[in-house]
Regions:
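Conserved ankyrin/ankyrin-like repeat signature
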Residues: 12, 44-45, 77-78
């Protein structure tokens, strides 16, 4: 599924999800598919993953959320999209 997310192939990711692939699958550094989609600025992919149960506040080993990755990659269009689903930064979560 990782390759499809990086390519931005929404249809391929839909197929993986239909086959039962874990939307919150953990990769290197404990990142999730949503982290990678946010880092790559894939708005449609971000929405698909969230609609399928992606944890918007999943944290990497370094304490970063998908919103942090969108911010660090300067994908401004994703900030409100992730926020409307309850997404926070790692710092915000630590402060709670």
């Amino acid at each position: 599924m990782w390759g499809a997310i990086i390519k931005g192939d929404v249809e391929e990711v839909k197929q993986y999800l239909a086959l039962g692939e874990d939307v919150n699958l953990r990769g290197l550094g404990n990142m999730t598919p949503l982290h990678r989609a946010a880092q790559n600025g894939r708005k449609e992919m971000v929405e698909l993953l969230i609609e399928n149960g992606a944890d918007v506040n999943a944290m990497t080993d370094s304490g970063e959320t998908p919103l942090d990755w969108a911010i660090n990659s300067r994908h401004v269009k994703l900030y409100p999209q992730i926020r409307k689903h309850g997404g926070k930064t790692g710092e915000e979560l630590k402060a709670e």
